[in-house]
Design a protein with these regions (language model features):
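Secretory targeting and sorting signals
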Residues: 1-32
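Residue-level hotspots at or immediately adjacent to binding/recognition sites across diverse folds
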Residues: 32-375
Length: 375
């Protein structure tokens, strides 16, 4: 994700608003007179723009321009991930060097249509039969593998072709975690062994999280700040509340998502914000497990956040705006659609999203992979 903070693909895998209305009429003039007309403003909404009947779902998406982007189809089981390229507003399948097995694209990020990155989750190579995670780059004409990691990737930030950050997830018991890695265009360097996700502003300003802490990298060291008091109270004996995603937009505008980790339904979900001096909790909703890295800015001060309640068979796309979390309207509703990734179209309040439709309250039946657009 490019400065953005996914639902684990093993369970199901780069968020945000009822946005500004667009003017739809232009003034007309005749000789000696002038007149203007104004039609009703178009109300933005989510709509499906691509559907693929398959047993898999779209796991990641990135907008690379107003009418360009990439999306990735797969479920991490047997078949290799498949890429779709958006050009001129039309999605088409494109060549991609995916590998069969437990590989799925967990995140995608870009700085331009000719600098696009895809990151596969992998299962880790610490145990027999495990698969590596990979970082792949598209230069405008072809994809190539840049780096292979022995542990799973959870997300990434891409600032330039020579400024790429990759973040791991919490390792299984007895398995090492990937931590945080930086790529300067020639060399990969591990800068943390404990960071579980992150979002970069520059090579010397990176935000990450680990459990109840948010951490900041200044180019030389990490500084941790506990936000435990801002998270929901512990709801069960099995899982602790924790930070699950972070999105840095500027030095004084950093967002984090926390979750209470209730055993069955997940939640509550909280929105945290850093204004350059302190962290505060701005909103809370009694919804399911908040998605990790791929939540998105809505381009107008809010967020789009993916959210899931597996036991209830529901998936919500939440919108944060002006201190409130609300459930966004999606084409098939929360019982028949799941959104796994959201990406802001650069310079706009429009969004691309990736996910699936499925049988009512059943993520495993009747799957149709879908791509959506908010405009």
């Amino acid at each position: 994700m490019s400065r953005k903070g996914a639902w684990p693909i093993a369970v199901a895998a780069g968020a945000a608003g009822l946005l500004a209305l667009a003017a739809v009429a232009a003034p007309a003039a005749t000789a000696g007179t002038a007149s203007s007309s104004t039609g009703p403003a178009a109300v933005p909404k989510w709509r499906i723009t691509e559907s693929v009947k398959t047993s898999a779902n779209f796991t990641a998406v990135v907008a690379t321009g107003r009418t360009t982007g990439w999306a990735f189809l797969g479920n991490g089981f047997n078949a290799a991930p498949v890429a779709f390229q958006l050009s001129g507003g039309t999605w088409k399948k494109a060549p991609f060097p995916g590998t069969k097995g437990d590989e799925a694209v967990i995140d995608a990020a870009a700085t331009s249509p000719s600098d696009v990155w895809a990151f596969t989750e992998g299962t880790g190579t610490s145990f027999p039969g495990g698969t590596p995670a990979r970082a792949l780059h598209y230069n405008g004409s072809k994809w190539s593998v840049v780096k292979t990691f022995g542990e799973p990737i959870a997300g990434a930030s891409v600032l330039a072709a020579n400024d790429v950050w990759v973040f791991g997830t919490m390792g299984f018991t007895g398995e090492p975690a990937l931590g945080a890695w930086h790529y300067n265009g020639s060399t990969w360097t591990q800068v943390s062994k404990t960071i579980q996700g992150g979002s970069a502003l520059s090579a010397s300003s990176v935000w990450g999280f680990n459990g109840v802490n948010v951490e900041h990298w200044n180019g030389a060291k990490w500084t941790a700040t506990s936000v435990k008091s801002l998270l929901p109270p512990k709801a069960n004996v099995d899982m602790d509340p924790q930070v699950v995603g972070i999105l840095a937009l500027s030095a004084r505008n950093v967002w984090a998502i926390g979750n209470g980790q209730d055993t069955d339904e997940g939640g509550p979900t909280v929105v945290l914000h850093y204004n350059g001096s302190k962290w505060t909790r701005l909103a809370q909703a009694n919804r399911g497990f908040a998605a990790g890295p791929e939540f998105s800015s809505d381009g107008s001060g809010g967020l789009w956040i993916q959210n899931f309640s597996p036991e209830a068979g529901t998936a919500y796309l939440l919108h944060y705006s002006a201190g409130k979390l609300t459930v966004a309207a999606v084409p098939d509703g929360p019982t028949k659609m799941a959104v796994y990734a959201v990406s802001q179209i650069p310079g706009t309040t429009q969004q691309l999203a990736a996910g699936e439709t499925h049988a009512s309250r059943n993520f495993g039946a009747g799957i149709v992979a879908v791509l959506l657009k908010y405009s």
